[in-house]
């Protein structure tokens, strides 16, 4: 390919991608402003960045970090810790914190990724899994990369305690769920069982839109990972 052809190809690709990049810039600017506004509202100061030795029951910086995340993600409360070694660890904490023996967990977005299957324990035996704990499990296969909306009515019943919605594609080839997708799916779950807890796995989904799942009326709880979007590649764990 000659230089002029390469130049023309580059200009064509840049022109076609310009709208998408402009949208990304808008989202980044919106979320930057939202975080800064939240930091001002929480009155974050230098004192909150001080190192704590851990010899106390309270930690001013830790408490403010929780408050800040709750405000940014429009949640009632937030728990942000580097002691969570990964997103899977955070997700497992939610599941084990809510579910009890005899409860039913349903995955609305098909089979979760491998590390979550180890936590659940139904695809293969694993020590300390939800299955071993006595939690029942079922999953709704995706249809051509999309959530089976009619299937939600069948799989979510009166005994379903928690419905898991995985936003990212994980290791599959399906498209990730948009905020509008999550809005529609969570509303359908609540229509099938108003008492079912809607839990969104938001790993890789933080700050990619101007609305977070916890801002939606039918999403009850969400978990993500500091080592992905929020940490910007800087957080060692979380």
Predicted regions and their residues:
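Active-site-flanking structural segment that lines cofactor/substrate pockets
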Residues: 49-79
């Amino acid at each position: 390919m000659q230089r002029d052809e390469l130049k023309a190809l580059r200009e064509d690709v840049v022109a076609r991608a310009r709208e998408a990049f402009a949208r990304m810039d808008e989202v980044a600017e919106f979320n930057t402003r939202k975080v800064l506004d939240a930091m001002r509202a929480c009155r974050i100061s230098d004192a909150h960045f001080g190192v704590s030795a851990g010899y106390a029951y309270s930690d001013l910086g830790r408490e403010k970090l929780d408050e800040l995340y709750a405000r940014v993600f429009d949640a009632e409360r937030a728990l942000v810790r580097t002691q969570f070694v990964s997103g899977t660890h955070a997700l497992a904490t939610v599941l084990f914190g809510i579910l009890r023996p005899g409860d039913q967990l349903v995955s609305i977005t098909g089979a979760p990724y491998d590390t979550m299957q180890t936590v659940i324990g139904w695809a293969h035996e694993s020590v300390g899994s939800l299955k071993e704990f006595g939690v029942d499990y079922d999953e709704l296969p995706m249809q051509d990369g999309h959530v089976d909306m009619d299937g939600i009515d069948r799989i979510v019943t009166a005994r379903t305690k928690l419905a898991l919605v995985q936003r990212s594609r994980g290791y599959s080839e399906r498209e990730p769920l948009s905020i509008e997708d999550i809005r529609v799916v969570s509303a359908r779950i609540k229509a099938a069982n108003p008492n079912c807890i809607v839990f969104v796995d938001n790993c890789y989904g933080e700050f990619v839109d101007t609305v977070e799942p916890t801002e939606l009326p039918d999403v009850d709880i969400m978990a993500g990972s500091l080592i992905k979007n929020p940490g910007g590649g800087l957080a060692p764990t979380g």
